[in-house]
Amino acid sequence: MSLLMISENVKLAREYALLGNYDSAMVYYQGVLDQMNKYLYSVKDTFLQQKWQQVWQEINMEAKHVKDIMSTLEGFKLDNSPVKTTQHEFPAHDGEVWSLPVPVERRPSPGPRKRQSVQCNDNKSHNNRFGAGKGPNLPSSKNTNNVKMKPVRAREKKDTFLKVKDEKNKSSVDVSETEVKKFDGTGYDKDLIEALERDIISQNPNIRWDDIADLEEAKKLLKEAVVLPMWMPEFFKGIRRPWKGVLMVGPPGTGKTLLAKAVATECKTTFFNISSSTLTSKYRGESEKLVRLLFEMARFYAPTTIFIDEIDSICSRRGTSEEHEASRRVKAELLVQMDGVGGASENEDPSKMVMVLAATNFPWDIDEALRRRLEKRIYIPLPSAKGREELLRINLKELELADDVNIECIAENMDGYSGADITNVCRDASLMAMRRRIEGLTPEEIRNLSRDDMHMPTTMEDFEMALKKVSKSVSASDIEKYEKWIEEFGSC
């Protein structure tokens, strides 16, 4: 399918519509809409998809206008035919024509008119045999014949119009069905499918790569795993196939979930946000079905990224005394779907890939088999001095700062703070001026404060007070555990 063909069909549809050949115009309009729907599925760029959707809506609106014109014209034809019948059937000046009231009574039903039209044909032949001897009756027979035939033609046109309308309605239903790609869950419970479809992030999380400070290595790896295979599918084949699993390891508050949101925003793939509650059920055997259904839906909506937050709660180490039989079956199904016969790695087409993106704060509790399937295991550390400074600038870009605020000095005093801790410090410091302003005021006085009174710049003293109130949440011993694990099992 080429864009030139779509353009030519649009031109033909508009030309036929301008010339008054509305039936042919509708055929071309319907074909153009179908071609554009098929072409939309091949467009990966979101901006281009929005442009094509706008064009589709404009063409669809033109087709609706043509359809309205057709229905209006048919309405005129159907409304005019009975009026002509009454005018010609009972002429006021012709005294020899019987003014029978029967045809007037039969007007609502179309059946008797067909029978009368046959009789009129017989009368016509009879009048032709007699020639001019029956002169006064000849015009009335002709008029009657014409009058009787016109409703038949109108009914035939009405029938064909209704058939065409039904076919167009069916085709419009088909177009609306092809607009939204819907998973066929034959063999699965409808509630299970709806539960997983709710975890598809269709709305934009609005987190960009630039909104995440530092973590350049992690960004580079995620782009290589998700973005580049979409841009260069001919390169990522065979031994260079895309990574099927990425595990992000690090202390809490370092930006693992933010990286996943950036993947959902930037990478233009279907994004499943899965937690342990999504894949658990109180009914026996349904948790394994959910895992299998998840990967089948992921392959259907491919390219897909499945983000499993806190994966240690779903796939912890097997064989322990605390393990339950149900959780063991769920882990086995997850491992099979990721790297089993017919699993997610069977498809060699990079545009149909299914990648599992996982995050955990307890990597030492993850099962060994899952660790092997998550081929890339990267460490998301605490922000460096440069990262802390960059994170401060991102958090404070909407605040009015006093002249004495030194961001470099604040970043140096935050050594050992995680990204979430730095955000909490900035939030607390931004509230200091408001706290000083409303101190000692009554609730009525606080309500009467103007907006200008509340917008006061944040000073260096506010940051110093916030640093005293907000302590770091990650200990040095925890950092040593993460570094030791990543040194032993890391795969950057």
UniProtKB/Swiss-Prot annotation:
Listed InterPro entries: AAA+_ATPase (IPR003593), AAA_lid_3 (IPR041569), ATPase_AAA_core (IPR003959), ATPase_AAA_CS (IPR003960), KATNA1 (IPR028596), KATNA1_MIT (IPR048611), KTNA1_AAA_dom (IPR048612), MT-severing_AAA_ATPase (IPR050304)
Keyword Cytoplasm in annotation: yes
GO molecular function: ATP binding; ATP hydrolysis activity; microtubule binding; microtubule severing ATPase activity
Major localization class: cytoplasm
Keyword Magnesium assigned: no
Keyword terms: ATP-binding, Cell cycle, Cell division, Cytoplasm, Cytoskeleton, Isomerase, Microtubule, Mitosis, Nucleotide-binding
Polar residues: bias regions: 138-147
Record-listed ATP binding positions: 250-257
Biological process according to GO: cell division; microtubule severing
PANTHER family: AAA DOMAIN-CONTAINING, KATANIN P60 ATPASE-CONTAINING SUBUNIT A1
Subunit comment: Can homooligomerize into hexameric rings, which may be promoted by interaction with microtubules. Interacts with katnb1, which may serve as a targeting subunit.
Protein name listed in UniProt: Katanin p60 ATPase-containing subunit A1
Lineage per the UniProt record: Eukaryota, Metazoa, Chordata, Craniata, Vertebrata
Gene name linked to the record: katna1
